Amino acid sequence: MKMFITMSMCLSVIACFYAGVGTGETLVPALIIMGDSVVDAGNNNHRITLVKANFPPYGRDFVAHSATGRFSNGKLATDFTAENLGFTSYPVAYLSQEANETNLLTGANFASGASGFDDATAIFYNAITLSQQLKNYKEYQNKVTNIVGKERANEIFSGAIHLLSTGSSDFLQSYYINPILNRIFTPDQYSDHLLRSYSTFVQNLYGLGARRIGVTTLPPLGCLPAAITLFGGVGNNMCVERLNQDAVSFNTKLNNTSINLTNNLPGLKLVVFDIYNPLLNMVINPVEYGFFESRRACCGTGTMETSFLCNALSVGTCSNATNYVFWDGFHPSEAANRVIANNLLVQGIPLIS
């Protein structure tokens, strides 16, 4: 009975939210995005780095079929989230030429492909560290304050949803391939190391006036096509369980750390968004979600290609990415991002209620 009441309340709240969106009003004043390639909207485009996506076939199903720097064939989960919140445009990449006075008032995207909780991960790939993303956010706050005044600006910052999605690069592009880190840390110890950075980040963001913060869990790392290729052994197309176990362990600690932060920071709404289970369910039961393929990605051979390896000359790229859970070796397709975003909507009710 309790479960029924809770579900009914959730459905009622969602219905009210959609009614509000129907009037043309947004549910929050702004949407702020930080993190890695899963949510990068083009901040790496003009950096000297191999981690870019501003060329075909990336973006082939996006608005105007343009490669904006998003690591997908189309929309990111955060793009769908912006739509669900009532925004008519997506948070603009802060370092892009499109970032101007008008669209900055409804938020911005500071994410950078190959960034992580650990700044060392981003530095290795010449990506934008999480520390620098926070500095860019402070600069953004000054710009908004100059436009609308301090009082209105503070209302925007405190009412905005700040979404952080990172951590996969720390494991897949750093820890698992770096023998030095392997000697220094066990996977469990490395998680603790990352979560100390996460805790500091949230406290700093809170100090800048943020009161609504969402953070995504790690995905099932061992089910990403590139991870299966790199760590699964020859001829294996099954998820790598030890990597998934590391992700589950990290996610448990992420939840506990977030609870402690909420208890110690008055007025903070902090939600941990579970993307592990929604993505795992799509991998295990693709047909239930309308997918045909969940082990290989759409781009190229589907086993490894990402960033510059996923290009217009990649042989074997699929013609219809909606059949695939993954677009490239590391990133979900637009269709999978839509499923993830719908899950975020339900989980995120505490941030907008």
UniProtKB/Swiss-Prot annotation:
Gene Ontology terms describing biological process: lipid catabolic process
Enzyme Commission designation: 3.1.1.-
UniProt entry keywords in alphabetical sequence: Glycoprotein, Hydrolase, Lipid degradation, Lipid metabolism, Secreted, Signal
Membrane-spanning ranges: none
Signal sequence region: 1-24
Catalytic machinery residues: 37, 328, 331
Keyword Transferase set for record: no
GO molecular function: lipase activity
The keyword tRNA-binding is assigned to this record: no
Subcellular location: Secreted
Sites carrying sugar chains: 100, 255-256, 260, 320
First-listed, main subcellular location of the protein, grouped into a coarse class: secreted
Enzyme's top EC category: hydrolase
Effect on the protein of changing residue 193 to R: In strain: cv. Bla-10, cv. Chi-1, cv. Co-1, cv. Cvi-0, cv. Di-G, cv. Gr-3, cv. Landsberg erecta, cv. Li-3, cv. Mt-0, cv. PHW-32 and cv. Sha
Xref: SUPFAM superfamilies: SGNH hydrolase
One GO cellular component term: extracellular region
Family: Belongs to the 'GDSL' lipolytic enzyme family.
Protein's name according to its UniProt entry: GDSL esterase/lipase At5g03810
Organism: Arabidopsis thaliana (Mouse-ear cress)
Taxonomic placement: Eukaryota, Viridiplantae, Streptophyta, Embryophyta, Tracheophyta
